[in-house]
């Protein structure tokens, strides 16, 4: 009996629409698919068509040695209409199965389906692909030790190269500013909230030219907190929060158009959340924007209570929140817009 085979281009197009979580189970089916799923062109196409998962990084109050490192999934279905505050965190998505998992503190960044994790002793970084289970441990060196006589601090920037498994120092670059928040990655570049003595701005690092560039900031108000996020892997979003005597307001800005490598940023005011006067204030750690439903999901830590984290769901003048279980000291719990991928490293 003869089997009819699809043309390779059509077969690749069909498979590129299958979620990576299912493709990883098919890679041992035949040699042709095994090679296809490792083709960078196919992986990029599959990543571009993948659906986004919202995950919440929090080790919770569980023992890491018993439960491994948990990444929680937040179910947003139904929130647009009912806005039910009982909708919260589902305790299931990925577990980090690594013999040294108990040394990992938590996720600090993410890009193209890969999660960057910090270790408790601050001597290594861990790159983790939750979809494939692949991990890589990267050694880092603390150049500056605790020294009371140290009065001059020289900042150097390094790039880690996966192919050579080595660090490379970037010479002759200095943004000459204060970086105020963790960065986000979008279309191969990194973006940070930064400031100098005169103003605040978005600081972009271009990995192609290996240079910093200053971009426009939406508002120069005296906000105490500013956090960046990414919208659909196309736009940047910025959260600003001020602590007034009468109320706490959260201002959400979104870039008007998709990010273009050669253009400055233009911002629009997306949403203003007024929490009113509250006795227990919180500081946003991360947030995600749903443009279509004009909604924001925000992870915050309660001020003066280090180990308590809450999640806010806010839209059109309505806010609800749900408290999350306590987290270990030093662990930063935040929301991640995660897309499963077959990226290899």
Swiss-Prot record:
Residues 1-46 form the F-box domain. PANTHER family: BNACNNG10540D PROTEIN (PTHR31672), F-BOX PROTEIN CPR30-LIKE (PTHR31672:SF13). PROSITE patterns: FBOX. Disulfide bonds: none annotated. It holds the Pfam family F-box. InterPro entries: F-box-assoc_dom_typ1, F-box-assoc_interact_dom, F-box-like_dom_sf, F-box_dom, SCF_F-box_component. This is Putative F-box protein At3g17265. Transmembrane segments: none annotated. It comes from Arabidopsis thaliana.
